[in-house]
Structure formats: C-alpha cells, structure tokens
Amino acid sequence: AAAALVILPNTSASVAYAMSQVPVLSRLVEVVTFRDYHYEDDRNSADIQVPEVTVAPDTDADTQKSSAVSEQTKKTAEEINTEIQTITDRLIAEFEESKANEEGYQNMTVKSEILATTDQYFTLKLICFQSAGSGAEWNYYYTIDLSTGKRLQLADLFQEGSDYLTTISDNIKQQMKEQMAADENKIYWLDSDTPEWDFTSITDNTSFYLNQNNEVVVCFNEGDVAPMSMGCPEFVIPNEVLAGIRK
C-alpha cells in the first residue's frame, strides 16, 4: 500500500528536527528543515528534505555596521530560501505528475549539506538526485559572506580587472590532463574528437565554494565537463595559483 508523509513548514524551532543536530558553524547563520516530503510505493519513492537558512538575532548591536550586516544577512537568507523552495516545489510537482501518470519506476532525493564554513563564509549545498531508468545528480551552492551579509559571487574574491576566469580555467585544464594521465578511467571533455563538447572556460555563473583552507573549489554537475559516469567533478584551485589576483 502506498504511504505518503508531508510535513508542512515549521512553526516552531523545536519542529526543525532533521537538522537540529547540526552544530552552529557561525554565530549568525544556521540551517533547519523547512519541509520533509516523503512518499513510497511499489514504483515510486521520494525523500525530499527542504532546508531553510535562518539568521540568529543580532546580539552585538553595539555598532551600526553590525546591525546593517545582520539585516542584509536576513535578506540574503530569504532570497536563498525562496530559490530553494522554488526548486524543491518544482521537483515535487514533477514527481507527483509522473506518479499520477504511472510512467514507470522513479526515485527522487533532495538533501543538503553544510560545507566547510569559516568565520567569514557560510556555504550550503543542495544535492538533488533523480532516477527513472538512469540516474542524474546535480547540485546548487549558496555562499554568504558573513562580513557583508551578501551572497558571495566569484568576482567578489578577485582584484578588479584581473582575468581570474582564464587563470582558474587554465588550472582546471591542467588538473584534468594530469588526472587522465594518471588514471585511464578518468575522462574529461578536453582536446577530444568532439570539440564542441570540450571544456573551454568557466563563467561567473559556474558553481564554487571556499574550503577550510580558503581555496576556491570549482564545482560542475554531471555531464558538464565529463561523461555522466564521472559524477559531479570538483577542482580545488591552489592558493598559490591565485595569489597575485585574490583580494
């Protein structure tokens, strides 16, 4: 027999149970579960956990700047939450439509992970997986600059006028070549027989985050720069590569 459980938006912090064990990694920002959608029958299964970024009350209101950063962080968190809810609402609607049409077997999972977070940056990763015959995974990254409260853009990390896109892209190409030379099972679309598929350059919209070593980590989804079997590749750009152009 089919069984479905839908937990509606939380009205109390105590209801935010699924991520309540995650420690607060910054004094300002934390994550709770906004909604938990679960469904399972003989042909369909879904486990969709919708995270929500929350901002702690500003306890350091001694300065006008602190209050302004707190308000900006709240605004940024609201924007991120709206984007996440739009994504997950769409995925739930697609799942339910496919289920209603009895289109075969399907599985959908959405979860989140707090990535390496420092005193200055907070990053939430939304992980989506969908399978119906074959499977696909794709991710979204949300980084808040805790010193400004704004969502961090790649350009924010570099000196004005610097060609950071080329510098990062060249290093990624070098890493791709080194990985393929060391492991025949590693395949990237680089100098291939189908040049139109080859990786040429990242853009300002390419996903990234900063790890605990303050290194830029560039993230691709399945099929972006390699066959789907390679998963979602990530490339850590060494600090020394960007030393001359980072702010």
Regions found by a protein language model. Give the residues of each.
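Compositionally biased intrinsically disordered regions enriched in Thr/Gly
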Residues: 8-247
